[in-house]
Amino acid sequence: MFSSIIKSCYGSNLLRDIVNHPFNVELMNGTLNIESFKFYIQQDALFLDGYIRTILTTVSRIEDHNDVIPLAKVAQGSIAVNKFLCDHYFTIYGVRRGKKSPACFNFTNFLLSISYSDTYEAITVLYSCMFIYKTVTDNMKSGFKENNKYKDWLDFYSGSLMEYGYATLENIVDKYCKKVGVNERSRMLELFRISAQFELDFWNSAYNFSRFNQFPKEH
């Protein structure tokens, strides 16, 4: 199954670079620059807009009607995550909605373009994003201290909404992996690798933001 193949990639250089990225390490340690975190929250909310649209486009095109309601619930969960970011962090830190960074713009454009491709491709990139986030948050759990100022972020991002989205997409992507041929499976792995690279670029952008002082302005 596709999820089993991906899970065997835990030690791959790209996934290791994501898990050990300074942004994620410092977030886990509670030492991350607050301006970098604010920039990340702003961009993550903008990213989720594109991710939600990708889910909804996929829902409208998916062949198996049994997957429609579960996928719609994943979209609903992602909307709840986005609302949490805006209601909680935007208020606490005075974050404005702003514009997409180049990394966020490229990532969401990639997702939306794939949503109009074959359905198995759309499901693959949606699952890849969930898988990578789960890998990162699972790795963080053992290192997070109760007094870490970012602990509510971890608690929410490793909570039931994300778990449901991950499990649902894993179930659907594995069904597609069984149905498609060898070439399509290779394409699924390629899409996972591309998604992981976009994720890495996203964290690079957040971590290096303060260095370049390029906080996108509000519309």
Q: Model-found features: residue ranges?
A:
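Secondary-structure edge/capping motif, primarily at the C-terminal ends of alpha-helices
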Residues: 58-62, 114, 137-144, 176, ...
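Active-site-proximal alpha-helical scaffolds that flank and shape metal-associated catalytic sites
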Residues: 7, 66-164, 193, 197, ...
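Acidic, carboxylate-rich catalytic segments that either coordinate divalent cations
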Residues: 189-219
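A non-catalytic, amphipathic alpha-helix used as a structural packing/dimerization or gating element
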Residues: 39-50, 73, 77, 187-194, ...
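Short alpha-helical hairpin
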Residues: 7-32, 51, 170-179
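Long amphipathic all-alpha helical oligomerization modules
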Residues: 164-193
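Alpha-helical bundle segments that constitute or directly flank the non-heme di-iron/ferroxidase center
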Residues: 13-17, 31-61, 124-134, 203
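Structural helix-adjacent loops and short alpha-helical linkers that scaffold large soluble proteins
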Residues: 62-68, 181-182, 186
